[in-house]
Curated annotation (Swiss-Prot):
Name of the encoding gene: htr1
Official protein name in the record: Sensory rhodopsin I transducer
PROSITE patterns reported for this sequence: CHEMOTAXIS_TRANSDUC_2 (PS50111), HAMP (PS50885)
Domain annotation Methyl-accepting transducer: ranges: 214-455
HAMP domain residues: 55-107, 142-195
Description of what induces expression: Expressed constitutively throughout the growth phases, both in presence and absence of white light.
Domain of life from the UniProt record: Archaea
Pfam families, per the entry: HAMP, MCPsignal
Family: Belongs to the methyl-accepting chemotaxis (MCP) protein family.
Alphabetical list of CDD domains matching this protein: HAMP
Keywords from the UniProt entry: Cell membrane, Membrane, Methylation, Repeat, Transducer, Transmembrane, Transmembrane helix
Spans traversing the lipid bilayer: 11-31, 35-55
Biological processes per GO annotation: chemotaxis; signal transduction
SUPFAM superfamilies in the record: HAMP domain-like (SSF158472), Methyl-accepting chemotaxis protein (MCP) signaling domain (SSF58104)
Length: 528
């Protein structure tokens, strides 16, 4: 064993001391042959050895304690060194290595904490943007869904024939307001058309009743004329008087025929008005179809806006994923810091290990909070995306209802075309009645001429009376034909027109159709 190896080992030096003390005891015992002296010499040697060893050990421990205390106080730049080359020197070298490692780890942790704080700041900003986007999306989704539901309810009622329905256009969304205004304008024009057709139908009914009543009176007068002719035939002596009476009756018939002709002319004018109303209704329905096409285009624009919002939600989702990845990396860094703290504590530096562990726990806590915030952002984005899809579905449902409304308007246009055909038939019937009335007037005139001839030629009284009777019967048949035609006209064309108009519910007060009426508000004038 060399002197150098003894200096590098505290145990070796202590062993050499004990050997020297034992040698001293042996020497004293051999020389003095006295046990007491030997014991005293042994105790003195041990005390001397212990004092020297204790002094060196205490000095080394004091020196290391002072240096490690400065490290514990945060001075990681101090260099730990010792003049000893034994285990205490090795301990000083180990503490120096721990100091350097701790300083490097703390530098890394400071950098990691700075990165984590920046990530936390970015996460807070992203969360604020996500919350603002969520609020905006919720408001937009709720507003569009409510408006679409209200529009759908009103359009469904209108499709069932209730033309008094209007939508509330008081909304901050231009696209939906345009849809509502177009629908209300279409319903106003369609209701005005139906009201016009209804009014004309009522006038036709009233005037047809008047013509029918006039025909009945004419028929009664014709029957009276027939009886008069019979009296002429049976009472030849009163022939002249009866003929004069018949002439008067014929004049009444002629006047009635002229009245019928005038009424038929007026009815023809009314029929022309109905034709014009039907044409206006057809034009209004075609305009309504154009408006419905515009409504479909506006609804498509609304769907495009919602799809753009979905794309923004996808971008925010990508940002949240990046934040989650940063949080996971920070969490791994915190785990490494915890391992280093445990390692530092295992090497005997409890205070250093605890301080290192506190920093690691703080980093881990920040990482977990960042991960939690990122998860919340992802949850919010998922909810906003779901609501956006619901808005898209609602708008698409509105498009479907608009298509249904378009089909309804097309059906109404077909019905109006049918009404126009019925009006054409009415006009044809009126023309036939006009021709029949003209024939009746000619017949009455011929009858008057016949009565004049009978008056001038009494000898031909019987023959003329027979001709008169024949002419009057023919006239009665004509009047009956007119009456039957009017009844048929009333039962078929007019009633069919009224039944078709009654399919629609309209507001009798034409000023009540305002675009600012509440959705589904009841009609002011009641239903027809």
């Amino acid at each position: 064993m060399t002197i150098s190896s003894v200096k590098q080992s505290y145990g070796a030096k202590l062993g050499v001391g004990y050997i020297a003390t034992a040698t001293l005891l042996i020497t004293v015992g051999v020389v003095t042959q006295d046990v007491a002296s030997t014991v005293v010499a042994g105790i003195a040697g041990l005390l001397t050895l212990g004092s020297i060893n204790a002094a060196e050990t205490v000095a080394s421990i004091t020196e290391l304690s002072a240096q490690t205390q400065r490290v514990a106080d945060g001075d990681l730049d101090i260099e730990i060194d010792s003049t000893r080359t034994d285990e205490f020197g090795d301990l000083a070298d180990s503490i120096e290595q721990m100091r350097v490692s701790l300083r490097d780890r703390l530098s890394e942790m400071e950098a990691a904490r700075a990165d984590l704080e920046q990530a936390q700041t970015d996460a807070n900003e992203a969360q604020a943007e996500a919350e603002a986007a969520e609020e905006e999306a919720k408001e937009l989704a709720t507003a569009y869904q409510d408006i679409a539901t209200e529009y759908g309810t009103v359009m469904a009622a209108a499709a069932d024939g209730d033309l008094t329905q209007r939508v509330d256009v008081a909304t901050e969304y231009d696209a939906m307001e345009t849809v509502g205004q177009s629908f209300n304008r279409m319903m106003d024009e369609l209701q005005e058309t139906i009201e016009t057709v209804t009014a004309v139908s009522k006038r036709i009914t009233t005037e047809t009743d008047e013509i029918t009543e006039t025909s009945r009176r004419v028929q009664q007068e014709v029957d009276a004329a027939v009886e008069t002719v019979a009296d002429i035939q049976t009472q030849a002596t009163d022939q002249q008087t009866k003929l004069e009476s018949a002439a008067v009756d014929i004049q009444d018939v002629s006047a009635s025929a002229e009245e019928i002709a005038a009424t038929i002319d007026d009815l023809a004018d009314r029929s022309s008005e109905v034709e014009e109303a039907s044409s206006d209704a057809r034009t209004a329905s075609e305009t309504a179809l154009t408006e419905m096409d515009q409504i479909q285009a506006d609804a498509a624009d609304a769907v495009t806006q919602v799809e753009t919002l979905q794309q923004r939600m996808a971008e925010i989702t990508d940002i949240a994923d990046i934040i989650s990845e940063i949080a996971e990396q920070t969490n791994m860094l915190a785990l490494n810091a915890s391992i280093e703290a445990a390692r530092a504590g295992g090497q005997g530096s409890g205070a250093d290990g605890n301080g290192f562990s506190v920093v690691a726990d703080e980093v881990k806590s920040l990482a977990e909070e960042t991960q939690s915030r990122a998860d919340e952002i992802a949850t919010v984005i998922a909810e906003v995306s779901e609501q956006t899809e619901e808005v898209t579905d609602s708008i698409q449902a509105t498009e479907t209802r608009v298509e249904t409304g378009t089909e309804t308007v097309e059906s109404a246009l077909s019905e109006i075309a049918t009404i126009a055909e019925a009006v054409d038939d009415i006009s044809a019937s009126i023309e036939e009645m006009r021709e029949t009335t003209s024939e009746q007037a000619d017949t009455v005139q011929a009858t008057a001429d016949s009565i004049a001839d009978v008056t001038e030629a009494s000898a031909e009284t019987a023959t003329t009376a027979e001709e008169m009777s024949t002419q009057i019967r023919r006239q009665r048949d004509v009047v009956k034909s007119i009456s039957d035609s009017l009844d048929s006209f009333r039962e078929t064309a007019v009633d069919d027109l009224e039944s078709r108009v009654r399919l629609f519910t309209i507001n009798t007060d034409t000023t009540a159709a305002s675009q600012t009426r509440a959705v589904g508000s009841p009609s002011i004038g009641g239903d027809d």
